[in-house]
Amino acid sequence: MERSEKLLSRENSVLVIVDIQDVFLKPIKVRDFTVENIQLLAQAAQRLQIPVLATTQNAEKLGALAPEVAEAIDDAPVVDKLCFSCLASEPFAQHLQATGRSQVVLVGVEAHICVLQTALDMLKAGYAVHVPYDAVASRLKRDWKYALLRLSHSGVMVSAVESVVYEWLYEAGTDSFREVLPLLKAREQARQEAEESDEEEESEEVETPPTEDANEEAEEATESPPTSETGSEE
């Protein structure tokens, strides 16, 4: 059976990690969540022999790649740039072309600036671009939301981290599946433990009537991919 061209394949994919630097990560509320998802993708890519490229923005002044991501990508190329679109950097464009891959899984920060500009330039250059919503972030949730809406409307495939990994794997029962499955199980276990911890903290708090501020904070804390309906609410 011929697979849909809208699905990723490990033979055609490259993972691009954009500007995961502490200076950009610190103001982001979902920093740990985003970085952990990027680590998972990087580790899965390494095990599946999928090329990985990373960028930094003006590293001399803004700092190097965050240590946890630098460790996850091992010796993959890291290209420093000043332009916001990665593809506008000639060294990066050369590295990307050298991979020979046509599908780009694009992750990093910020969703509405460097990720967005890079994705749209890659589309124009003929790449199929996939952006997992849970591996990109912005300082403000509304910026993240509208970036993903704009990308989706422009032809980018907005996806999820697990979707990406399972599309790479294609089927169960293989050596590749057995090699990557522990990463997925560890991620699920960590998420369950985090949820249980949150529930315990909530149960210890004194119940008070909700306020408008509390409702707004709860909404901001909820991470879900944007839709046209959610976009119209803002």
At which residue positions do the language-model features occur?
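The conserved SAM/SAH-binding core of class I Rossmann-like methyltransferase domains
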Residues: 18, 55, 132
